[in-house]
Amino acid sequence: MSRVKNLEASLLAFDSKNTEHFKQQLKLIHNSGIQNIHYDVMDGKNVPNVAFGTEWLKELYVDGFNVTVHFMVNKPRKYFNHFCTFPFNNLSFQPEPISKLNALLLLKKIRKNGRKCGLAFKPNTNLLKYKRLIKHCDFVTIMGVEPGFGGQEFLKDITLKNLRTINDIKKEINPNLIIELDGGVNFDVIKLTSKYVDTYVSGSFLLKQEKTQELLDFIKSI
């Protein structure tokens, strides 16, 4: 039985330094039928880059996008306390910098705040160590590259291993878990991973397509 596929457009690849161009790119995505946005937040410490604060969340909400915020920060609870008054639908964070207890408390806090909650894992993280936490997640993001920058090459071997592991965990303890792949996504990667993945996150590759609708249609056809 094939899985229903979704596509999230990663704002990390958008031209955020040029407001007009950024808005044009958003319009292009919206007109192509893509309703989901992946909104990376980076502190420059958890990953070697800095990205988005809250500046675009209200506009994305007004435009009708479903927004998944992804914290790549060392203090996710502090960031959530700031972000929680802004409109978005889902939130994931990297659990590696904090204790498992604090990660569990944050997952519960996110859900209590009315959002879907998830964890995002770096390629070399041992997923089995986070099995008990995954039970409390609505979704999990598997990174196909080292997080921080867009346009990287897909890490095939380790990512396939992680996708198999997270699917095994899903079957065992959380059958409704949504599995998301973020990083290195292209047509070949989608074909290779389609039986493991529900949602693909694409930025650089998506914006390179002359017709973004073709990528969306391709994902839904797999």
Segments the model singles out, each with a brief description of its role:
Residues M1-N90, I98-L101, K109, C117, ...:
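Conserved N-terminal beta1-alpha1 strand-loop-helix module at the mouth
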Residues I37-Y39, M143, L181-G183:
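Active-site flanking residues adjacent to catalytic metal/cofactor-binding acidic residues
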Residues F65, F88, N113-R115, K170, ...:
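A short helix->loop->beta-strand "cap" motif at the edges of active sites that frequently abuts
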Residues L91-S99, M143-E153, Y196-L216:
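Glycine-rich phosphate-binding active-site loops on the catalytic face of alpha/beta enzymes
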Residues C117-F121, I179-D182:
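Short, hydrophobic beta-strand segments that form beta-sheet elements in well-ordered domains
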Residues M143-V145, D157, K161, I166-K171:
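Classical nucleotidyltransferase
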Residues D168, E172-L181, N186-I190, S194, ...:
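Alpha/beta catalytic cores of nucleotide-metabolism and tRNA/nucleoside-modifying enzymes
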